[in-house]
Amino acid sequence: MGSLGAILKHPDDFYPLLKLKIAARHAEKQIPSEPHWAFCYSMLHKVSRSFGLVIQQLGPQLRDAVCIFYLVLRALDTVEDDTSISTEVKVPIVMAFHCHIYDNDWHFSCGTKEYKVLMDEFHHVSNAFLDLGSSYKEAIEDITMRMGAGMAKFICKEVETIDDYDEYCHYVAGLVGLGLSKLFHASGAEDLATDSLSNSMGLFLQKTNIIRDYLEDINEIPKSRMFWPRQIWSKYVDKLEDLKYEENSAKAVQCLNDMVTDALVHAEDCLKYMSDLRGPAIFRFCAIPQIMAIGTLALCFNNTQVFRGVVKMRRGLTAKVIDQTKTMSDVYGAFFDFSCLLKSKVDNNDPNATKTLSRLEAIQKTCKESGTLSKRKSYIIESESGHNSALIAIIFIILAILYAYLSSNLLLNKQ
């Protein structure tokens, strides 16, 4: 759960945080008994706790397919990311990865921590993959093949231009969007979305992660590959690592704002994609990460902290997004609120201010035209109730009641 200080400052976070904690515990207890499926779901919770929780929104068959799709691509990504593997070894592996998923004897030791376990025990993922229906397997194989080919191309190529950046993000994330759309369609729950909209869903998330993770990636040892395009950063500094130095703060923020503005171009497509979804479970599965993405961009924009430390939404706000995202009106409301926050941070002297404002106004126009903004729950316009001692007292009363309830249940279970 969030820290006590954060809860006291934002007491309305408490209930969503509590619900999130209970849901996470429940999700971890839903691990199947069959060995290969037990491995896959327990590994899913280890490599992505948030995804492991969001995936529980889906029905059983689709949930299994998405779980395996995620783990297969996570394994492929582990090979791509391992800088200790030579290009001569790495390229053939990623190119043939779509074949390896059919071979339950195949494994390749690489990565660290839980990712090494995933790779060493990959036969569990292969066995689970082989259990899936043929339409699910075909979709996963196709996307894995295309992603592997794209990764192989960029193992030997730097991201120089914005077109390169879009192409790389297509291979590693846009294809995930295409694959998920295929899985949703295969389940019979959704019409097949267009490739361009599916691609934008992936690019919006991937570009947000690339922006947010600048400092972690630039400081990684051994040195990680970087994906900020030279066409953008070279306008501001001579070397990409120069952005992290305090004397370059003004230029660094301008570069950051340029990157955020580039990411915002995908937001309208994302809204269109989500508005076309019919099933509430699939809708929540798709919508929650997209709201988190625009919220993260709003925090990163014009913020030197991106080059100094970690910038992310507080856990309580994340819990609120997960708890409150139920309908498209919630999505329009969140995108509108976060675009308002972004707009308030635009410096008119920024070289990209006009372009940034234009993109934000386009997002706001789409949200307004939905006609649902009056129903929205605000994520970012908060009252000063965080300092209200009565509310703080209520929190501790609730905690005491909860503790007593859980303790009594524990005693009853022991009898």
Swiss-Prot record:
Keywords: Endoplasmic reticulum, Isoprene biosynthesis, Magnesium, Membrane, Multifunctional enzyme, NADP, Transferase, Transmembrane, Transmembrane helix
Signal peptide (UniProt feature, chain positions): none
InterPro entries: Isoprenoid_synthase_dom_sf, Squ/phyt_synthse, Squal_synth-like, Squalene/phytoene_synthase_CS, Trans_IPPS_euk-type, Trans_IPPS_HH
Sample GO molecular function, one term: squalene synthase [NAD(P)H] activity
Reactions listed under catalytic activity: 2 (2E,6E)-farnesyl diphosphate + NADH + H(+) = squalene + 2 diphosphate + NAD(+); 2 (2E,6E)-farnesyl diphosphate + NADPH + H(+) = squalene + 2 diphosphate + NADP(+)
GO cellular component: endoplasmic reticulum membrane
Top-level taxonomic group: Eukaryota
GO biological process assignments: farnesyl diphosphate metabolic process; isoprenoid biosynthetic process; response to jasmonic acid; response to molecule of fungal origin
Keyword match Transferase: yes
Residue ranges of the TM segments: 281-301, 391-411
Cofactor(s) listed in the protein's UniProt record: Mg(2+); Mn(2+)
Subcellular compartments: Endoplasmic reticulum membrane
Induction data: Induced methyl jasmonate (MeJA) in adventitious roots. Induced by A.niger mycelium-derived elicitor, thus improving ginsenosides production in adventitious roots culture.
Keyword Transmembrane helix appears in the UniProt entry: yes
Major localisation: endoplasmic reticulum
UniProt pathway annotation: Terpene metabolism; lanosterol biosynthesis; lanosterol from farnesyl diphosphate: step 1/3
Function: Component of the triterpene saponins (e.g. ginsenosides or panaxosides) and phytosterols biosynthetic pathways. Catalyzes the biosynthesis of squalene.
NCBIfam families: squal_synth
Family classification: Belongs to the phytoene/squalene synthase family.
Stated name of the protein: Squalene synthase 13
